[in-house]
Amino acid sequence: RLGKSKVKAVRKEEDLSEELTDEGFGSIVVIANVFGFKQVIPLAEGDNVIGRRCVGTVINTPIETGDMSMDRRHCIINVKRNKAGKLVYTLRDAPSLTGTFLHNEVLGDKDRVRIEDGAIMTLGATSIILKAGK
């Protein structure tokens, strides 16, 4: 099985459009790299625990990747609506071993940072981009 990737291949019929989900809470776009393929993962209201997909790990936003520098519970994006009805996104570290980076700045273990549409986050060697909902 030498050279066989543990990460599944992208199927031709798989829809990789970055359109928002029906719920409209936005999504994260995982940038393709040597560890994995492009993925568009919808976000839900409340805490979205993001990390490396692994059997037995309980997270609601798993990323399929071979990137071992990404923790199984790496960071959390909280999605909620403010009083005006606008979606507010807050990023925090889980905490992770390698740290969570927002625009190449590392977050501390206690940091809570508001993020906007197009925010670039780095988890281990994997980069993700926030696509905000309406």
Residue ranges and their predicted role:
Residues R1, N60, H74-I76, K80-I120:
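Forkhead-associated
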Residues K6, K38, V106-L107, S127:
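Short, solvent-exposed loop/turn motifs
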Residues R1-G66, N78-V88, A132-K134:
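Intrinsically disordered, low-complexity acidic Ser/Thr-rich regulatory segments
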Residues M121-A125:
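Conserved metal-binding segment of the jelly-roll/cupin
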Residues D67-R72:
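Short coil-to-beta-strand transition motifs
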Residues C54, D93-P95, V106, S127, ...:
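A short beta-strand motif that forms part of the nucleic acid-binding face
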